[in-house]
Curated annotation (Swiss-Prot):
The gene is PCMTD1. This is Protein-L-isoaspartate O-methyltransferase domain-containing protein 1. The lineage of its organism: Eukaryota, Metazoa, Chordata, Craniata, Vertebrata. It comes from the Eukaryota. GO terms for biological process: protein ubiquitination. It comes from Gallus gallus (Chicken). Belongs to the methyltransferase superfamily. L-isoaspartyl/D-aspartyl protein methyltransferase family. GO terms for molecular function: protein-L-isoaspartate (D-aspartate) O-methyltransferase activity; ubiquitin-like ligase-substrate adaptor activity.
């Protein structure tokens, strides 16, 4: 699936295309997509394909097309503090974006069939927390991943506000998925080649809406053990954060608010990340043709308008070239600067920065 929008040159360009095509429609979803570079979830040597609107698979590693993830994120109607379950969590790309919207008091769980993919997801999550410039701009609900078949979840597992299944669900498994959902919750999953949004309106009542025609590989059926029974999979616990973790969240929030107030007082607006300029297409000169004997000879049709357009294009190209030559200043991490200026032991400062290296 995919190919609904033009390929981008980088992550921001891809998001611009998804917005223009109305796959991304809300600000929170846009911010999450811009914060997580899709290319970071590709293996080395395959990143050139990261910004195309196409699915990608290598061994057990799989990423759906960007247009699919966009529709899923919009259909889930995510809000801070909700609980989310990703059935077939894969690389963790979607779960990480969801975590940016859920915030620190949400629940973010994923179950994935392949243990090597879970390890890959954990590596990518650790890399995002340690190195991404976006991490300090959000309050994050860190995903927790477990290995297992999502059709073997223990019957006494807790329910969730939002659920997404990233594999084709057969009709006889539809009710199994619905049971995992809280009343008032939203389940998004592919059923019979339709990405479907299901709202649980009551204990035994549901509302369904088809979102998009899709083609997903079906869910892998569970194997029976030596006793002829299925192994059950335990989901991560819904743990309450400890006091130390809560203190870190509120200190970072207070400092972030203080920075925003400082910038407002100075009349400095928060700048959005600079977008790559789209290059203007240069128009061709129009020629007129005259007959000289038996030959058709092209003659340039010079006009003031043609000359003005050519001069404007040249000036813009020269300006873009000169701007490209200017060395870019590295972005300042004001939150980190505030933390490092606090009168605290270095070990506490490191804890407040999540031990990030920049």
């Amino acid at each position: 699936m995919g190919g609904a929008v033009s390929a981008g040159e980088d992550n921001d360009d891809l998001i611009d295309n998804l917005k223009e095509a109305q796959y991304i429609r809300t600000e929170s979803v846009e911010q999450a997509f811009r914060a997580i570079d899709r290319g970071d979830y590709y293996l080395e040597g395959y990143r050139d394909n990261a910004y195309k609107d196409l699915a990608w698979k290598h061994g057990n590693i799989h990423l759906s097309a960007p247009c699919i993830y966009s529709e899923v994120m919009e259909a889930l109607k995510l809000q801070p503090g909700l609980s989310f379950l990703n059935l077939g969590s894969g690389t963790g790309y979607l779960s990480t974006m969801v975590g940016l919207i859920l915030g620190p008091f949400g629940i973010n769980h994923g179950i994935e069939l392949h243990s090597d993919v879970v390890e890959y997801a954990k590596e990518k999550l650790e890399s995002f927390i340690k190195y991404s410039d976006s991490f300090d701009k959000f309050e994050f609900c860190e995903p927790a991943f477990v290995v297992g078949n999502c059709l073997e979840i223990a019957s006494d597992s807790h329910q969730y506000d939002r659920i997404y299944c990233g594999a084709g669900v057969q009709k006889d498994h539809e009710n199994y998925m619905k049971i995992l959902l809280k009343v008032g919750g939203i389940l998004v999953m592919p059923i019979e080649d339709q990405l479907t949004q299901i709202l649980r309106t009551g204990q035994n009542t549901w509302e369904s809406k088809n979102i998009l025609a899709v083609s997903f590989a079906p869910l892998v059926q569970p194997n029976r053990n030596d006793n002829g029974k299925h192994d059950t999979v335990g989901l991560p616990p819904c743990a309450v954060r400890n006091l130390q973790d809560l203190a870190r969240i509120y200190i970072r929030r207070t400092l972030r608010n203080f920075i925003n107030e400082e910038m407002k007082a100075k009349g400095i607006a928060q700048k959005a990340p600079p977008k790559r300029k789209r290059r203007r297409c240069r128009r061709r000169r129009i020629n007129t043709y005259v007959f000289v004997g038996n030959q058709l000879i092209p003659q340039p049709l010079d006009s003031e308008e043609d000359e003005r357009m050519e001069d404007d294009n040249k000036e813009e190209e020269d300006k873009d070239h000169s701007e490209a030559l200017k060395p870019e200043e590295p972005p300042r991490n004001l939150l980190r600067e505030k933390i490092m200026s606090l009168p605290l032991p270095e070990s506490l400062k490191a804890y407040l920065t999540y031990y990030r290296e920049k």
